[in-house]
Regions:
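Extreme N-terminal starter segment of soluble prokaryotic enzymes
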Residues: 1-7
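Short, acidic/polar
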Residues: 19-30, 150-157
């Protein structure tokens, strides 16, 4: 079963949340010209890494803005989206979280990065997630890991 993936890279503007959300919307729209089955976004595209502002103040509160954007886009354009990851604030803690949506705009996967890269002090910015996620996109079994998590293959075994 062949699937067309569009993987989006972007110049994330650290601390400029409004710019980043606007830019992601533009890039999502542009990617439709490739007729993708699945669109994948980059890590921490909403805030960038190591923002100088206090991360808790600019992170997406409970992921609401990101979830609304991705769900609406997926449904309106009949495309699966793996939302890279965004900084999400929950109860005064920030997680590096990925959301996956099917073509109907339904949230089918949510995963928060479990292993921060401590030499880069990620663990000082983000709390670790506690569970893996497994979901299907167009009948294909999928799971999400984020960056350094790939060093822990037991997450997807």
């Amino acid at each position: 079963m062949k699937k067309r993936l569009t993987i989006i890279q972007m110049d994330v503007h650290v601390n400029d949340v409004e710019y980043n959300y606007t830019r992601v919307q533009e890039l999502l729209s542009q990617s439709l010209s490739e007729c993708p089955d699945i669109i994948v976004l980059p890590e921490t595209w909403n805030t960038g890494f190591y923002p100088s502002k206090e991360l808790i103040n600019i992170a997406d509160r409970n992921g609401e803005r990101t979830k609304s954007l991705l769900s609406t886009f997926a449904k309106e354009h009949n495309v699966n989206i793996v939302g890279g990851s965004v900084a999400v604030a929950k109860n005064d803690v920030v997680f590096n979280t990925s959301y996956a949506y099917n073509r109907e705009g339904t949230l089918v996967g949510e995963y928060s990065k479990m292993h921060g890269f401590s030499p880069a002090k990620e663990d000082q910015y983000f709390a670790g997630g506690t569970h893996t996620t497994h979901f299907e996109l167009d009948g294909i079994p999928c799971s999400t890991v984020i960056c350094y998590d790939i060093r822990f293959p037991e997450l997807v075994r």
